[in-house]
From Swiss-Prot:
InterPro entries: FAM47. PANTHER family: PROTEIN FAM47B. Belongs to the FAM47 family. It comes from the Eukaryota. The gene is FAM47A. Residues 274-288, 333-342, 449-462 have a biased composition (Basic and acidic residues). It comes from Homo sapiens (Human). Residues 195-257, 274-409, 449-573 are annotated as: Disordered. Residues 349-358 have a biased composition (Polar residues). Pfam families: FAM47. This is Protein FAM47A.
Amino acid sequence: MGDQRLQDWLRSPGMDSKPWYCNKRPSKCFAKCKHRRLRFPPMDTQNWVFVKEGMDDFRYGCPSPEDTLVCRRDEFLLPKISLRGPQADPKSGQKKLLKKAALFSKLSPAQLARKAFVEQVEAQLMAKHPLAMYPNLGEDMPPDLLLQVLKHLDPERELEDAWACCETQEKTTEVPTEPGKHPCGEFCLKPPETPVSHLLPEPPETGVSHLSPEPPKTPVSSLRPEPPETGVSHLRPEPPETGVSHIRPGPPITRRRSSLLRQLLKLDSERKLEDARAPCEGREKTTDEPTEPGKYPCGKFCPRPFETPLSHLRQEPPKTPVSSLRPEPPETGESHLRLEHSKTRRGSSLRSEPSETGVSRLRLAPPKTRRGSSLHAEPSKTGVSHLSPEPPKTEVSHLHPVPPKTGVCHLRLEPPDTSQVSNLLLYILKVLDSGRTLKDVWDRCEARVKKTKEPTEPHKSPCGEPCLQPPETQVSHPHPEHPKTRRRSSLHSQPPKTRRTSSLRSEPPKTRRTSSLRSEPPKTRRTSSLGPEPPKTRRVSSLRPELPKSRRVSSLHPEPPKAPESHQFSEPPKIRASYIKELLQEDTPSTKECVSDSLQYRYTSEKLREFFKWAGDLGADEESIRNLFDFTPKYRATHEDQKFKKVKECSSELKYSMELDEKDEDKFFSQEKYWGRKFHTPSNSYTAQRVKMKYGAWYLKPKLWKKLRSDEPLIDPKLLLKKPDEPDVLDDLYGPIAFKDFILSKGYEMPGIIQRLFARRGWTYDSVKTPIQRAMIFYKYKEIVEASEED
């Protein structure tokens, strides 16, 4: 019964799959017959080919078929799959060797002899003492450290020479040394009796560390260094950091010693030599790091100072209260003075920079303290030397030097020179304010110009400017010996590009005969910037004053000139309105109307400016051309803030050439209130809803599945087969039957649509023919009716 039910259940509709116990069938890949070919040839182990390693690498092309190892079933034992039971391995039938049987070596006699020789040599080497491999150990290792190693590794004193050398050196090092000579108590290098090439001198007796000389006790410091007559070419005094002079030998070589110690300490597996490990590790670190010249990684070599004459020495600083000298070989024929910052409390320091030309330069560095000065002179290869004067003992941050005829520098404080600015303002007013509307400004400028035009002595103002005379304070007047050439020294200057230019804090001039003078702004409260006076030369210098950082000095903003201002403004300068407002900010209150009125006359279009430029190149004057014609600009220069204009406020010229009618214009401007609105697009009311679908029951065949909604019931496939066919249009027509008769009369093949029609209706070709009987009766009756109607 049970088997019958199982079979019925398996044969039920939709259950065509086989039971579970029928799924595990033997593989079809393996052949049952011996000579039968497999369905999958790669699975046949008899056809496998074994190749060497790398022959299956096809990344760089096909490998060459040479030296290919091919193993067939006749040459190699391959695993075979058979349907029979497992067979015994043929190797298992061989007799196994007994455990006590002697296994003979597979090495050749030559290999055995070589192996025995190597073992013999190793045994001889290991039989010696471990320290015998280092014959120079006593020379490279310190005696105290070598003694500690020998105590642990050679307690029986087999190395007699090493013990004797170590004990003798230990006795010599235990001798007391004098204080200051050997602070470390180790190897001391005796000073050689021969001259040494490079030495450092002893320190000065003063407390200066960085070559900062003491302040001079006298108000005048006149130094005239001359080239030395000895063989010493370079003198550079540098103070040492300690009280003992240092020789500059190369640093001791401890790398070899440390490597020997590391190899010896490897024998100390119990780490008994902790004292020996520490210096070894320390030396290893110091030898790896780069050391500065003159410094030693361990700091144990302290040589004595040499007392013999030397070839190259570094001169000691003088013990007198005179400024120290620091001569260096200059690149040109003149000496350069270097004035470093002093650490004392008097005055500022002067410093010169080396020049690439034959002109020496002095730079006035910002003083760090109040008083004192330091002078560092350099020797020259010629007999000429320039000296740097000491500033006066007054609290002045900016000095105004006047180069006199004798070459002495005079320093004095003077009020600022405003003649150039007054001339500039007066010329601007002549150009821009020809009607003299700004009367107050005209009066002030003319008054200032009159004051500056007072007669002066010829030796005071060579260029028509106020001369600054030397002060009456105590000022050093060094008189240098000038060479026969025209080279001059410059104070507080930058490197000039010419050889015949003297500049006071000058910028590189664009021409060869002009130099710009520029005063530095003072950092005090009640001092003003000083304008220097140029020397008596044929070159004219230009003044560029800066704004002083003081509270009681008026600020003047002159225009940055594009050409030298010494030509008294031969061309009208191009000045902007904002720049004029800054010039007139302090003297007179400027308003927007004044600026706009002054600029109204100067307004020109771009084409007119190009025309004036072209006429100016030909030699014509712009003002003369303006006087010939009447320029009435349509648009005035305005400085109002820009704002957005509406469409109604636009001028008629900005509108399109195609004008609108009155009705269209009213309609166009009436829509202005709707322009700012945002048009919201209507939201999509339709939202797609997810519908769960199903495709059929799992027990049905996939061919019978149909896409349906999850809530719809399934359709029985049997009912689909029993469903009657829908009536066709061709069933009641006369044409298909007549067409069938035509096909039969001709002997052609019957079309499929006619065959299906006759099969659906159950007709045969002989039973249904044309003419049809009912059709004949119908047409006969119709003819009778038509004939009766005619009668």
